[in-house]
């Protein structure tokens, strides 16, 4: 069963269930089928089946098979999307480990179970709609190089939730007690590198704000020339530049270690918008501090990307519809405006003379 048009429109405007750095991968309209079912008050089972006549190896990151508290489905109640309180992960598509993939023979299925109350507040109880659609990246054979992406959409699952029981489900993300700009436990060497990354990001964001105000390259990266939209884009960049201006004050907390268990090989950083938290993974420190040409990520690029997610800096926060220039410029105008990497790419382009 496909989603109702109203639910699809709602999701398109407010969230993307699963998102990947596809980088202009060939798109396939079939090959994987996904069915959702309820197995408890707030627990969901997802069964993914290989409907093709050949073996398929798909990336588990940001799918139902991701062990981290990433978005696995979208949830709606009374015509509104329920806020997601988990994390958004930014990973390096060029350095994916074999463990990040799952292989299915033709006709084979695999299932994953998860509790949607771990990353969303369902204590209001009542009827909820649960659904997901998007693209799942795939690799050939036992390789780790992404070669395509398969489009999928699930059934729309109706769940009648007991709010009192849902409220007892422990959140996947622990509450943060202290609030400081850079975590004081961040070692001196890493703190210095991160401080420089914030300074680089401040420069990117300031130049991007000025460029957006002037309308430079907006049509290329955001598919718009509208003055009001340009002003909104500029204001987001201004807010990011201000946030980057201090390593001891601000609305977000930046961690140098994986405090919330969102890192694994290939993941660069992640953001928890509900708690205004950004975390760098080991792969972040392997990136070049500064890139002077092109659109490849450096430390400042990643900071801009993550800060666009943070609603405490500028609301609404962005989603991860796509990564990489080739895929980002293929998004719809609405998705461009709400996609984190479009902002990083834009900031890099106007700053590096792209």
Curated annotation (Swiss-Prot):
EC annotation from Swiss-Prot or TrEMBL: 3.4.24.39
Name of protein: Neutral protease 2 homolog MEP3
Keywords: Cleavage on pair of basic residues, Disulfide bond, Hydrolase, Metal-binding, Metalloprotease, Protease, Secreted, Signal, Virulence, Zinc, Zymogen
Purpose of the protein: Secreted metalloproteinase that allows assimilation of proteinaceous substrates. Shows high activities on basic nuclear substrates such as histone and protamine. May be involved in virulence.
Organism: Coccidioides posadasii (strain C735)
Active site: 306
Subcellular location: Secreted
Reactions catalysed according to its record: Preferential cleavage of bonds with hydrophobic residues in P1'. Also 3-Asn-|-Gln-4 and 8-Gly-|-Ser-9 bonds in insulin B chain
Gene designation per UniProt: MEP3
GO cellular component: extracellular region
Matches recorded under Gene3D superfamilies: 2.60.40.2970, Collagenase (Catalytic Domain)
Signal peptide: 1-19
Family designation: Belongs to the peptidase M35 family.
Co-factor remark: Binds 1 zinc ion per subunit.
GO molecular function, one term: metal ion binding
PANTHER family hit by this protein: NEUTRAL PROTEASE 2-RELATED, PTHR37016
UniProt xrefs under InterPro entries: Fungal_M35_metalloproteases (IPR050414), Lys_MEP (IPR029463), MetalloPept_cat_dom_sf (IPR024079), Peptidase_M35 (IPR001384)
One Pfam family hit: Peptidase_M35
Any one GO biological process: proteolysis
Cofactor requirement: Zn(2+)
């Amino acid at each position: 069963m496909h989603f109702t048009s109203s639910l699809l429109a709602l999701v398109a405007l407010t969230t993307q269930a699963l998102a990947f750095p596809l980088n202009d991968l060939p798109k396939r309209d079939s090959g994987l089928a996904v069915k959702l079912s309820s197995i408890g008050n707030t627990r969901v089972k997802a069964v993914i089946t290989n409907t093709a006549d050949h073996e398929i190896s798909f990336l588990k990151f940001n799918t139902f098979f991701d062990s981290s508290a990433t978005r696995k489905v979208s949830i709606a109640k009374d015509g509104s999307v329920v806020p997601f309180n988990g994390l958004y992960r930014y990973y390096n598509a060029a350095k994916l480990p074999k463990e990040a993939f799952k292989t299915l023979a033709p006709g084979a299925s695999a299932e994953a179970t998860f509790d949607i109350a771990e990353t969303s507040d369902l204590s209001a109880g009542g009827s909820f709609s649960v659904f997901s659609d998007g693209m799942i990246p795939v690799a050939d054979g036992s390789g780790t190089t992404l070669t395509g992406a398969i489009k999928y959409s699930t059934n729309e699952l109706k769940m009648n939730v007991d709010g009192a029981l849902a409220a007892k489900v422990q959140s996947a993300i622990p509450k943060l007690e202290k609030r400081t700009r850079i975590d004081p436990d961040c070692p001196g060497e890493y703190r210095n590198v991160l401080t420089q990354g914030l300074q680089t990001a401040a420069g990117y964001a300031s130049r991007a704000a000025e460029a957006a105000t002037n309308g430079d390259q907006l049509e290329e990266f955001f598919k718009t020339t509208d003055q009001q939209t340009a002003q909104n884009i500029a204001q987001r960049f201004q807010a990011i530049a201000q946030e980057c201006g201090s390593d001891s004050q601000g609305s977000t907390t930046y961690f140098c270690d994986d405090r919330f268990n969102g890192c694994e090989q290939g993941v660069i950083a992640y953001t928890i918008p509900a708690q205004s938290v950004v975390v760098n993974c080991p792969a972040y420190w392997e990136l070049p501090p500064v890139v002077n040409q092109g659109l490849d990520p450096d430390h400042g690029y990643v900071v801009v990307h993550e800060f666009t997610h943070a609603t405490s800096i500028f609301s609404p926060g962005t989603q991860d519809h796509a990564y990489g220039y080739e895929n980002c410029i293929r998004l719809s105008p609405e998705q461009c405006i709400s996609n984190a990497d479009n902002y990083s790419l834009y900031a890099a382009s106007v700053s590096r003379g792209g």
